[in-house]
Amino acid sequence: MAMQSVRRSRAVRRSTSLLAVVVSVMVVAGLHAAAAAASPASDEADAQKNKALVLSGPMTTLKAKLQGKTNVDFGPNCDTTTGRVKIPSVYAPPCVQPFTGKNGGATSQGVTGDEIKIVVYTGDPQKDPLLAGQIRAAGASLDIEPIRQTWQGYVDIYNKMFEKYGRKISVEFYLASGPGSDTAAAKADAIAIAEKKPFTVLGGPAQSTTVFADELAHRGVLCLGTCALAMPQKLSDRNKPYLFTEGPSPEEAATLTAEFIGKQAGPGKAQYAGNDATKNKNRVYGIVHYDTPDGQYKGLFDTLKTQLKKNKITPKADQSFFLDLSRAQENARTIVTKMKDAGVTTVIYTGDPLTPGAVTKEATAQDYHPEWIIGPTVLADTSIFARTFDQEQWSHAFGVALVPGRTPQDLNATYNLYQWFHGTPPPNNTYGVINPSVLLLATGVQMAGPKLTPQTFRDGLYRSPPSGGDPINPQLSYGKHGAWPFVDNYGSDDAGMLWWDPSAVGEDEVHQVGNGLYRYADGAKRYTLGKFPAKGQGGLFDTASSVTIFDQLPPADAQPNYPPPAAGG
């Protein structure tokens, strides 16, 4: 078992947006973090399940199998052994036959015979004091030019390596007009971008993506990846087929959380609590959950309650809160008082990565020592934020790991992909935020075929088989592939199990060495719905079988060794 590594990663210039420092450390930490060999057999089985969809699309390796064709030339960018594009990533899509002929020209807004126009939104630290302070605290530069260079660098990779049917992806950058928390600015920016008539938008205002994405979709513009972070299911449903993100929906994450709690922390003694008195009590559950003034995340809370009930758990208390840093201490006092007065032994937390800092410190002030269960969160399951929580309290925290097991930078496939293609490292440390969104776009374009529209883009994502599912690669799929009992417009399908170890030493997600790391149970194994282990299994709080940071890739996750393109792009 590879254990934690404290070696320093290669130096990288740190220029960033709010997405990189605050919201999408989740992606930096591991989503699309490394590569593993694809499984042709599982791809072919999935193609049989989605036969009509695969047959209706371009000639792919999977379509050729279904039609019994063995003499299709898929070109030099295809690994004929795996049937996927020859890039060092488990998320490479199936190969398609190189295109010749007419592509239909202007098939959609932002699409011409030779171009796919996209807009990349970047935050402006000069207009956002909170963002600027966070960037400086992370040791980063306020210069946004390197982040634009990195966006363009990944676009260049997929322009060369993926099929775009005679077109190329063309990037226009848009600088935010206000801070990421300004919903009025977010809406105005979405309108201004929509008036440019792009095919899609990547990136968005971190705290206002629901407003931003909703406005873009309403105006017929696709919003992909970090454009639509933590998007509630109802927002996606009313905006089909314009919103696709990389992570699970909040409701999907809640469903996975409820299964985890039912199997690993169901009714019984609160054995992981912070003092003996609480450990000897039967579990009493409470939920602390983030929402917005207009109730965007009520669906998450309702789903969590419903799914907990299916697992024989009925919370005794709940407390919602808004993310208002000026009232953090007041909110914390309200939350802790309510949980303590209700006799809650087991607090289920779902929300942002800042609130637990105030809440855990207030819990200590009130001599309240419950179990803390980490549910659907944005970044509370990352070490960079968990180190800011009360360490004694958080040493009794455990839950679902939406992010996968971590690797140091020199084993990170997103980092190495850039180096492989360009011959140089990414210009800054936001590569983990950037690449997944560009890959999502390029995959949908390749799998859509020459007539590119939002509808064929959706079908392209749906016909691509699931990828990942190992300790350092979340399973990623869109459509209906068996992970969920419905057609799914969200990305990752699985989760691991973790707990906080305040004594572990190593790098956080922005490569700062310090005390405190999450331990991933059972070698960071991940589980889809219905597959979480029963109590006493799965290695929760078993240090010997856990991992903090892989110092070498598990054998099954070794990166494919392809020669780089001759021209380096």
Model region roles, listed by residue range:
Residues 246-247, 362-436:
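Extracellular/periplasmic periplasmic-binding protein-like sensory domains
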Residues 50-105, 109, 326, 466-569:
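Solvent-exposed, acidic/polar segments of extracytosolic/periplasmic ligand-binding ectodomains
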Residues 26-49:
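C-terminal region of N-terminal signal peptides and the immediate post-cleavage residues
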Residues 1-14:
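N-terminal secretory signal peptides that target proteins for export/translocation
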Residues 73, 198-318, 371-399:
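Extracytoplasmic ligand/sensor domains, especially the bilobed periplasmic-binding protein
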Residues 43-189:
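N-terminal extracellular/periplasmic Venus flytrap/periplasmic-binding protein-like
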Residues 352-358, 403-467:
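Extracellular/periplasmic ligand-binding modules, especially the Venus flytrap/periplasmic-binding
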Residues 146-152, 159-238, 246, 322-329, ...:
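Beta-alpha junction/loop-to-helix N-cap segments that form part of ligand/metal-binding clefts
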